[in-house]
């Protein structure tokens, strides 16, 4: 067996001491802070690209990969649900999934490019139409939020169950703090979003937050990358499940729920809900999907 490499104690002793000119520590990013001895090896960050074409292909591959992960999570339900990403070159265009293709079969080449200012299909897959309600919701969100590059929406079981309460999630555990003061509730159900007005109403309810609970409908999340938005959706779905279980447990009156305090929730939000961190969180799911099914979703 090969010997395990260990740091020499003399190395540690040779580090700058307090008061020396080089002793000031560089402030860690949230992602770096989550890794023990993070600066020993740089953690993978959101990549940059030399061309729009390279970034576009990367976005579409990760979008398709997110759908594959969602399929294993059990989020697929008929033609419901959609993910969109803003085109890196043309900021008035988004890419969205086609109508009726199962999440578990989605590929990068399936995606449709839509000008969200005009509603016209301008590229990508022209063999299958997009979901009209999806185009309405996502177009409105991208118009209203130029800072957002990806939007996710689905009718997953626990999200739509919890949405019937028409109230925000409570800070009941560490993970749900990703949404501390960063999610809202659309308190009106306006039916299938076939009109531009319903899409606009949803976008208005989203406001400046990361996510929105659509009453009697489902969940919607956003992100700087599709990875961030898709992972946030998974966190929100599980947070809805956790709260439903907790509400059922306390209904008998024998136990009480304990909320995380505002200070602690804000602290968790700062360190866990950073775009780089959430991007990194999704990568293990994508690697596992590739391990299970290969990389055909990138085609």
Segments from the language model and where they lie:
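Flexible, glycine/proline-enriched loop segments at strand-loop-helix junctions
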Residues: 53-56, 123-132, 185-193
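Short beta-strand scaffold segments in enzyme catalytic cores
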Residues: 82-87, 94, 160, 212, ...
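N-terminal low-complexity or amphipathic/hydrophobic leaders
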Residues: 26-119
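Solvent-exposed alpha-helices and their adjacent loops that cap or buttress functional pockets
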Residues: 75-78, 86-89, 103-106, 142-145, ...
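Class I SAM-dependent methyltransferase SAM-binding "motif I" and its flanking Rossmann-like core
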Residues: 157-194, 198
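Short beta-strand segments
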Residues: 86, 96-98, 152-154, 214-215
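Short HxH-centered metal-ligating active-site micro-motif
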Residues: 117-161, 196-208, 217
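A conserved C-terminal secondary-structure "cap"
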Residues: 4, 8-57, 63-66, 210-213, ...
């Amino acid at each position: 067996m090969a010997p395990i490499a260990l740091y020499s104690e003399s190395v540690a002793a040779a580090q700058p001491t307090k008061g020396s000119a080089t002793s000031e520590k560089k402030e860690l990013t949230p992602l770096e802070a989550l890794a023990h001895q993070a600066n020993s090896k740089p953690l993978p960050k959101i990549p940059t690209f030399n061309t729009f074409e390279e970034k576009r292909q990367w976005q579409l591959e990760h979008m398709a990969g997110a759908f594959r992960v969602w399929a294993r999570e059990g989020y697929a339900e008929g033609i419901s649900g959609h993910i969109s990403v803003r085109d890196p070159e043309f900021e008035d265009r988004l890419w969205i999934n086609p109508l009726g293709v199962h999440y578990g079969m989605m590929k990068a080449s399936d995606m449709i490019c839509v000008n969200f200012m005009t509603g016209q299909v301008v590229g990508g897959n022209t063999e299958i139409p997009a979901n009209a309600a999806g185009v309405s919701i996502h177009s409105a969100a991208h118009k209203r939020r130029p800072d957002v590059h990806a939007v996710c929406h689905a009718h997953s079981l626990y999200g739509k169950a919890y949405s019937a309460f028409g109230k925000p999630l409570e800070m009941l555990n560490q993970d749900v703090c990703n949404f501390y003061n960063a999610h809202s509730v659309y308190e009106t159900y306006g039916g299938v979003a076939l009109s531009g007005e319903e899409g606009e109403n949803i976008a208005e309810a989203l406001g400046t937050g990361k996510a929105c609970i659509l009453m009697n409908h489902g969940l919607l999340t956003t992100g700087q990358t599709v990875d961030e938005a898709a992972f946030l959706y998974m966190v929100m779905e599980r947070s809805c499940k956790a709260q439903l279980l907790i509400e059922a447990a306390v209904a008998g009156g024998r136990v009480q729920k304990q909320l995380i305090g505002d200070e602690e929730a804000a602290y968790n939000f700062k360190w866990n809900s950073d775009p780089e961190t959430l991007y990194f969180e999704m990568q293990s799911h994508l690697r596992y999907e590739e391990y299970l099914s290969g990389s055909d979703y990138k085609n």
